[in-house]
Structures are given as structure tokens and as C-alpha cells.
């Protein structure tokens, strides 16, 4: 491609509304342009990278045995009502009506559509397992779209759905897809981690997320320093402290703590560390058969934070997790929130593992402006149910027994789920088994954020000059910069000859033949992030050389003109060959 005939829409200034580096560089490099909040047009340069990501995803999915389909983006409400998600999904589901007043939605995901398709197409166990995928535009009406294509409302996603006769078959495909995702992210040149995850609104029994490690990541991911354990912060297990709980050493004492309503304030007032206290959080209980919901107390160590996903998934807790209001607390306990404690508490109590290991601790006295010191489980407060309620912290023991936990920031670019029969049962998707009996199919689903990968790669691969693309997804693998080619026929001819030679060898090449100053050309090529750059100049040609510089290199080097291709093949062995 000749730059003189190509849209090079680079910008010198960083847009004021671009918060993270990938958003800034995608705008400055001329990859995308904003249409409205969370909506972006992909310009030719950005689209080249996007298509390369799609190609790698498609190739690996095809290798796995999955079959490509393309489903409608607009979906009828009846399918979502059948699965029960029409009301459950919330505000992210963009609902609309056609001219006849019928309800539709713009699909954020396609479980319902694929289940409807397969229940009408597959009839026998002999047709299973089957895995179908698409690469398609999705829409989620994000409350606060931000970070460019990282958290856009409209985005491109690869979503796949597998169907099975039994859980064992699902397990096998799940393993295949896990490896397929690793193959994809390896080929994309990303530093990533697969981690155990919560299934969220999609549902299902088991799931893994794939995170690109980046300081700008919105998610916290946890992994062992010495083992294979890895999970996101929502799923990471906080193991119980080792050893027995210490024996009581203090007597229970009530202390006046006027105006002290937070853990930090009480700790400072009493002169003791927060880890020697507990905090009591009251949440709504699961409704009984009459539809009435009481309260449940969650007890954590004072320096720990509640993991809301863990709590919400516990039996007896209302979903979604709902904190009790001040009025509800005062009515049930008789005090304000800052003074609650587990001693003689008139509601069911669930104690976190770490809090259950404390002795001689501090807690609220269940009356305003008073706390208790020297509190001990069994003697002063009942402890009938212990659960993992908290977020892990760096340095915690790893659940696999190998080393301690490290916490990093990550960008989620993939997620795989074992759905089980959540959708197939609700929508009666079944086949006849080997005995001729009707059997509800087991399902899996597997998503990759294709457009998000582009931004995530930039978060990992950039410097002060711009993007540094991995060869596999660079919009162009090679740039040829001609210096004063519009004035020098020798330079123009040499540039054209090298351009054709590299193109015929299978490389994606950008020939920068623009009538621009050398500094402008170099700055644009570095901003765009093209991995390999050759400079053609009269001075170099007189010596029989070209100047070469890799995007990650500090130094330039002179290469004999007739060795340019062989040099490039060594520098980029995959290239386009």
C-alpha cells in the first residue's frame, strides 16, 4: 500500500477525553474515530489490525473443529422471555420495537438464538458434540462507556456455543477450548493469564477468564508465586489461617466509644490494630415461601473487605446482594450501623474464616457509641457457620499450598463457561439418546472480545513514541520510507523495487512515498507502530545500503540492498510467509 493513496490520519495532540494509553494512541494513530459515546468508526489502519485478530481467532477456532455461523444481531423478545433473561439482564439490554409493536433487543450475547437454532436442527445424540461460533457485532448499553474500544457499547466479539449429550462430553470440549484460547493469545503475542472466574449473568457451573496483564486493567487477578493457581479477585479463595484459634486471654468489657463509627476510628480510639477487630455487615436474606426477607449478618476481620460475589453466591443470601438500610438496621438491632457486633445478635450470623480465627477481639456492642473488647467465640458469641467471605490480599497463602498470592491488574479478553443445562432446559433443547429417550443437552459458551484485544495489545506494547505492534497483528509488518523520492527518481525506483519484492514475499508493506519531511514520516511510522522500517535515501544507495530499524530497537543498521529480504526473514521469520 502506498501512503500517498492511503488514509494516514495521525494526530500530534492527545485528545483530552482519552483516559488510557490505548485510547489515546488509537485516536492519534488514526485507527478509530468517535461517533458517539461508546460508538467508534474503524478507519482503514485500525481495520487492518482488527481483521488480523479476527483471522487468527477464526483459524484457531476452525482447527478446534468449531463450525462458523452468523446469527442476527437483532433478536425477538420471545426467546429472552423463554430463557427468563428478558427482565433479569437489566439496563445493558437495548430493547426496541418494530413497526408492528413487537419487542426485540439488540443482542449483547446469543445463547437464546443458538439454543433455538440447535433445538430445531439437531435431533440425535449421533450429531453431538457440536460447536458453533460467530464473529459479530454486539451491543451492550453500558451506563458509562469509556476507555475507547476497551469498554464500548458496540463491539466485535467471537462467541461460540457447544452442545453435548452429557457433562463428560462438555468437559472434553471445555478443555479443547481452553487450549484453543491459549493458542490464540500465544499467536497474538500477548502476555496473558487464564484464571478461575465467577459465571456472572451468563450462568453455569464453571468458568475461566483470560486476562492480558496491564497496569491499566480494570480487573484484579490473583496467582500463586510458586504454583499454577490463578483466579480473578471475585473467585480467589482466601484460605483459613493455619493452626488452632488462640485461647481467650481477656475478659469481655464494654467500652464507651462516642462518635467512633468506623473500623479505623475505633482502632485509633482504642489504640489497637484493625486486624484485632471485626466488622458486622447486615444484608438481605433470601426470601422465604411467603416472600418475606429478613437480615443476615456477615462478620469479617476489620482490615478485610467483603467479596460481594462470594457472599451473593451463598445459600440464604438474597440475590443480588443488598445491604440493609440504616432504618432496617435500627429496627432489627436497635443501633446505628457503626455499633453492630456478633454478641447476642438477633439475626443469623455467617463468619469469615479469618474472623473465626480471632480471639480477644473488638466489635460493636449493639448499642450506639459502645464497643466490646476481649470478645471470644463460643464464650461470648455463637459461631455456627463459617464461610469464605473476603477478598484475598497480596501475601495470603495460595489455596494450592504452593507459595503466596500475588495480585496484578488485568484486562479481560476472553471468557469460557460450562453452562450446563441452564438454557437448554429452559428452552427445551433436547435430542434422543442411544436408548431413544429424550435428553436435555449440556451446553458450553466461549467468548473473545475481538475489538478489545486490539486495545489490550496496545496497553502492553507501547512507548513514548507510540504503538509497538507484535508482527502478527500489525496493520503493516514493514514500512519503506523514501527520502525525497518525489525529487529523486533513483530513490523512488529503489523504493518501488523493494516494495514489490517484499510484497511478493508475502509481507504487508506500507511504502511511505508522501511528499513530507523525513521527521514527519518517521514520527508517523513510529506512532502507528509498524515493526520493521527500511529507509531508502540517495546517500545509502550510493553506498549500496538501506537503513533498517526495528520498532523495538534503539540502534539503526545499514543493510546491503540485495540482502534486505533475507535480513527481514531472519528478523521476522513468520512475516507473511
UniProtKB/Swiss-Prot annotation:
Keywords: Aminoacyl-tRNA synthetase, ATP-binding, Cytoplasm, Ligase, Nucleotide-binding, Protein biosynthesis. Gene3D superfamilies: Anticodon-binding domain, Bira Bifunctional Protein, Domain 2, YbaK/aminoacyl-tRNA synthetase-associated domain. CDD domains: ProRS-INS (cd04334), ProRS_anticodon_short (cd00861), ProRS_core_prok (cd00779). It is an enzyme of class 6 (ligase). One of its GO terms (cellular component) is cytosol. It catalyses: tRNA(Pro) + L-proline + ATP = L-prolyl-tRNA(Pro) + AMP + diphosphate. It is found in: Cytoplasm. GO terms for biological process: prolyl-tRNA aminoacylation. Pfam families: HGTP_anticodon (PF03129), tRNA-synt_2b (PF00587), tRNA_edit (PF04073). InterPro entries: aa-tRNA-synt_IIb, aa-tRNA-synth_II, aa-tRNA-synth_II/BPL/LPL, Anticodon-bd, Anticodon-bd_dom_sf, Pro-tRNA-ligase_IIa, Pro-tRNA-synth_IIa_bac-type, Pro-tRNA-Synthase_IIa_type1. SUPFAM superfamilies: Class II aaRS ABD-related, Class II aaRS and biotin synthetases, YbaK/ProRS associated domain. One of its GO terms (molecular function) is proline-tRNA ligase activity. Belongs to the class-II aminoacyl-tRNA synthetase family. ProS type 1 subfamily. Catalyzes the attachment of proline to tRNA(Pro) in a two-step reaction: proline is first activated by ATP to form Pro-AMP and then transferred to the acceptor end of tRNA(Pro). As ProRS can inadvertently accommodate and process non-cognate amino acids such as alanine and cysteine, to avoid such errors it has two additional distinct editing activities against alanine. One activity is designated as 'pretransfer' editing and involves the tRNA(Pro)-independent hydrolysis of activated Ala-AMP. Homodimer. HAMAP family: Pro_tRNA_synth_type1. NCBIfam families: PRK09194.1, proS_fam_II. Consists of three domains: the N-terminal catalytic domain, the editing domain and the C-terminal anticodon-binding domain. This is Proline--tRNA ligase. It comes from Marinobacter nauticus (strain ATCC 700491 / DSM 11845 / VT8).
Amino acid at each position: 500500500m502506498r501512503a500517498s493513496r492511503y488514509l494516514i490520519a495521525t494526530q500530534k495532540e492527545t485528545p483530552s477525553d482519552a483516559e488510557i494509553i490505548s485510547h489515546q494512541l488509537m485516536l492519534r494513530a488514526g485507527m478509530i474515530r468517535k461517533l458517539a459515546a461508546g460508538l467508534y468508526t474503524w478507519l482503514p489502519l485500525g481495520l487492518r489490525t482488527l481483521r488480523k485478530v479476527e483471522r487468527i481467532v477464526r483459524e484457531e477456532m476452525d482447527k478446534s473443529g468449531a463450525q462458523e455461523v452468523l446469527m442476527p444481531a437483532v433478536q425477538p423478545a420471545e426467546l429472552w422471555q423463554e430463557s427468563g433473561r428478558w427482565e433479569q439482564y437489566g439496563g445493558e439490554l437495548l430493547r426496541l420495537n418494530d413497526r408492528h409493536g413487537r419487542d426485540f433487543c439488540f443482542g449483547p450475547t446469543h445463547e437464546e438464538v443458538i439454543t433455538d437454532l440447535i433445538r430445531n436442527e439437531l435431533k440425535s445424540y449421533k450429531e453431538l458434540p457440536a460447536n458453533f461460533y460467530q464473529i459479530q457485532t454486539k451491543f451492550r448499553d453500558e451506563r458509562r462507556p469509556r476507555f475507547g474500544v476497551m469498554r464500548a457499547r458496540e463491539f466485535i466479539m467471537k462467541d461460540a456455543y457447544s452442545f453435548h449429550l452429557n457433562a463428560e462430553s462438555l468437559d472434553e470440549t471445555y478443555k479443547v477450548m481452553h487450549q484453543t484460547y491459549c493458542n490464540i493469545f500465544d499467536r497474538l503475542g500477548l502476555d496473558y493469564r487464564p484464571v478461575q472466574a465467577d459465571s456472572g449473568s451468563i450462568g453455569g457451573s464453571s468458568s475461566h477468564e483470560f486476562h492480558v496483564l496491564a497496569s491499566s486493567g480494570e480487573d484484579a487477578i490473583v496467582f500463586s508465586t510458586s504454583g499454577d493457581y490463578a483466579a480473578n479477585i471475585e473467585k480467589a479463595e482466601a484460605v483459613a489461617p493455619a493452626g488452632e484459634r488462640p485461647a481467650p486471654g481477656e475478659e469481655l468489657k464494654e467500652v464507651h466509644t462516642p462518635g467512633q463509627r468506623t473500623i479505623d476510628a475505633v482502632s485509633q480510639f482504642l489504640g489497637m490494630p484493625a486486624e484485632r477487630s471485626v466488622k458486622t455487615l447486615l444484608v438481605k436474606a433470601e426470601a422465604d415461601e411467603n416472600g418475606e426477607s429478613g437480615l443476615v449478618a456477615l462478620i469479617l476481620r476489620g482490615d478485610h473487605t467483603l467479596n460481594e460475589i462470594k457472599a451473593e453466591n451463598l445459600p440464604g443470601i438474597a440475590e443480588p446482594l443488598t445491604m440493609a438500610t440504616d432504618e432496617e438496621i435500627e429496627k432489627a438491632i436497635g443501633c446505628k450501623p457503626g455499633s453492630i457486633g456478633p454478641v447476642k445478635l438477633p439475626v443469623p450470623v455467617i463468619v469469615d474464616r479469618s474472623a473465626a480465627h480471632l480471639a480477644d477481639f473488638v466489635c460493636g456492642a449493639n448499642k450506639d457509641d459502645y464497643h466490646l473488647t476481649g470478645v471470644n467465640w463460643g464464650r461470648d458469641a455463637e459461631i455456627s457457620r463459617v464461610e469464605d467471605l473476603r477478598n484475598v490480599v497480596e501475601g495470603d497463602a495460595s489455596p494450592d499450598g504452593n507459595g503466596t498470592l500475588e495480585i496484578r491488574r488485568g484486562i479481560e479478553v476472553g471468557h469460557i463457561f460450562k453452562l450446563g443445562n441452564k438454557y437448554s432446559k429452559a428452552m427445551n433443547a433436547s435430542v434422543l439418546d442411544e436408548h431413544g429417550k429424550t435428553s436435555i443437552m449440556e451446553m458450553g459458551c466461549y467468548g473473545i472480545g475481538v475489538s478489545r484485544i486490539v486495545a489490550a495489545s496496545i496497553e502492553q506494547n507501547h512507548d513514548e513514541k507510540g504503538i509497538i505492534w507484535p508482527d502478527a497483528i500489525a496493520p503493516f509488518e514493514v514500512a519503506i520510507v523514501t527520502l525525497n523520492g518525489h525529487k529523486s527518481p533513483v530513490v523512488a525506483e529503489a523504493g518501488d523495487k523493494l516494495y514489490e519484492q517484499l510484497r511478493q514475499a508475502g509481507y504487508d508493506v506500507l511504502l511511505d512515498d508522501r511528499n513530507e519531511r523525513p521527521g514527519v514520516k518517521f514520527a508517523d511510522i513510529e506512532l502507528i507502530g509498524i515493526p520493521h522500517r527500511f529507509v531508502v535515501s540517495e546517500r545509502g544507495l550510493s553506498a549500496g545500503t538501506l537503513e533498517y530499524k526495528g520498532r523495538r530497537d534503539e540502534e539503526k543498521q545499514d543493510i546491503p540492498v540485495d540482502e534486505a529480504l533475507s535480513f527481514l526473514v531472519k528478523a521476522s521469520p513468520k512475516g507473511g510467509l
